């Protein structure tokens, strides 16, 4: 991936936030909020099943922004596990590594990320990631918010570990498409 495109895309988000109120992208514009470290704004700790057993905290919900964006903090507890190769039809994602190390695939390119690194995953481009370190933590930004928050809540609510076929259906129900297996660490 070209660094210039990453920087340009990242910087293009900022004007959207400036004009979000004018274009009614923000749901609750008259009141700010603070989310304490180690907590989620909604849903408490979302404990995932299926893809990995990580914990997600919603920091900014799509409901807070009128669907404009969502921000999550992911505590990674699944060394050697990650997502299947998948794509989002309508959302771009940005990951920022707070702790630990991860491998990402974006299209055909593969990257190792460690603390302080970030990566941009454009919509409609297959991508996957796998946790290399024993534990880790990432901030995940999705723009627009789409249904990723619903995906996390759905997976956490299951009373069993989902089969690969169930996961494919859950991905599809939440505007994503599984296109390949999880990323193996080289």
Where in this protein do the model-derived segments appear?
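N-terminal export signals
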Residues: 2-26
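C-terminal segment of N-terminal export signals and the immediately downstream linker at the start
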Residues: 20-54, 157
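A short glycine-rich, His/Asp/Glu-containing loop-to-beta-strand
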Residues: 48-85
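Short, conserved beta-strand element in jelly-roll/cupin
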Residues: 73-77, 87-104
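Histidine-centered catalytic micro-motifs
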Residues: 83-90, 128
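Short acidic-glycine-tyrosine-enriched beta hairpin
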Residues: 108-123
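Ligand-binding loop in jelly-roll beta-barrel domains
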Residues: 123-149
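Acidic/histidine-enriched, glycine/proline-rich intrinsically disordered or flexible terminal extensions
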Residues: 154-186
């Amino acid at each position: 991936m070209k660094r210039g495109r990453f920087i340009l895309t990242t910087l293009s988000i900022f004007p959207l936030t400036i004009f979000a109120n004018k274009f009614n992208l923000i749901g609750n514009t008259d009141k700010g909020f603070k989310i304490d470290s180690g907590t989620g704004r909604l849903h408490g700790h979302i404990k995932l099943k299926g893809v990995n057993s990580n914990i997600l905290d919603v920091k900014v919900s799509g409901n807070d922004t009128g669907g404009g964006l969502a921000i999550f903090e992911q505590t990674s507890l699944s060394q050697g596990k990650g997502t299947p190769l998948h794509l989002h039809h309508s959302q771009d994602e940005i990951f920022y590594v707070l702790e630990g190390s991860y491998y990402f695939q974006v299209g055909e390119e593969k990257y190792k990320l460690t603390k302080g690194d970030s990566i941009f995953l454009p919509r409609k481009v297959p991508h996957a990631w796998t946790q290399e370190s024993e534990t880790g933590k990432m901030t995940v930004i999705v723009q627009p918010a789409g249904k990723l928050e619903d995906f996390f809540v759905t997976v956490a609510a299951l009373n069993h570990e989902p089969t690969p076929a169930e996961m494919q259906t859950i991905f599809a129900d939440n505007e994503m498409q599984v296109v390949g297996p999880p990323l193996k660490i080289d």
